[in-house]
């Protein structure tokens, strides 16, 4: 697979696009979306998918690109950035996700997904927390898209 270089904002854009087409829910709302170029703090993306009664899931996603917001090369390695994303998402977990319909994930360029899976595949804590991965990439025509990797796709 060709390495797709994406900024954090491009990764976020791809994941938002994915969620806008996900499932049959009636309410698809981006609750919060960070702008990496502004160096904002907090979760990078919060999305609510719900039915007409408001019942559904809230997604909290930490995103990492493999190039800076200004388009220049990253100084840190992928492993360092991905481990940083893991720590950030874990620190944001404040409630039992299974009782509150909260889903946590990390979004990265899809060309880095196999490396990410290899880093976390045997991690009991991340498997128990059901941390998902989202792979962002450019399509053949240059559009952004994302793929959701469920816990069953990731963990042993």
Predicted regions and their residues:
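Active-site ExK catalytic segment of metal-dependent nucleases
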Residues: 44-48, 55-74
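Generic structural motif
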Residues: 50-52, 92, 111, 138
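Acidic-basic catalytic patches of nuclease active cores, encompassing PD-(D/E)XK
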Residues: 1-41, 48-54, 99
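Short, solvent-exposed polar/charged micro-motifs at secondary-structure junctions
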Residues: 37-46, 142-150
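Domain-level recognition of nuclease-like catalytic cores that cleave nucleotide substrates
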Residues: 102-156
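Catalytic cores of nucleic-acid endonucleases
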Residues: 63-125
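Hydrophobic beta-strand residues in large extracellular and virion-surface proteins
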Residues: 15, 27-30, 45-47, 61, ...
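Short N-terminal signal/transit or membrane-insertion segments
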Residues: 21-29, 67, 150-155
């Amino acid at each position: 697979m060709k390495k797709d270089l994406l900024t954090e904002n491009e990764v976020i854009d791809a994941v938002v696009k994915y969620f806008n087409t996900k499932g049959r829910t009636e309410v698809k709302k981006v609750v919060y979306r960070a702008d990496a170029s502004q160096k904002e703090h907090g979760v990078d993306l919060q999305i609510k998918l719900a039915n007409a009664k408001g019942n559904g899931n809230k997604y909290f996603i930490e995103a990492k690109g493999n190039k800076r917001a200004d388009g220049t090369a990253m100084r840190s390695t992928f492993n360092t950035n991905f481990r940083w994303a893991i720590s950030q998402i874990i620190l944001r977990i404040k409630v039992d996700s299974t009782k509150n319909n909260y889903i946590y994930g990390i979004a990265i360029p899809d060309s880095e997904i196999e490396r990410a899976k290899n880093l976390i595949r045997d991690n009991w804590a991340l498997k128990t927390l059901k941390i998902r991965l989202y792979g962002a990439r450019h399509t053949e025509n240059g559009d952004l898209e994302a793929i959701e990797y469920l816990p069953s796709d990731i963990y042993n």
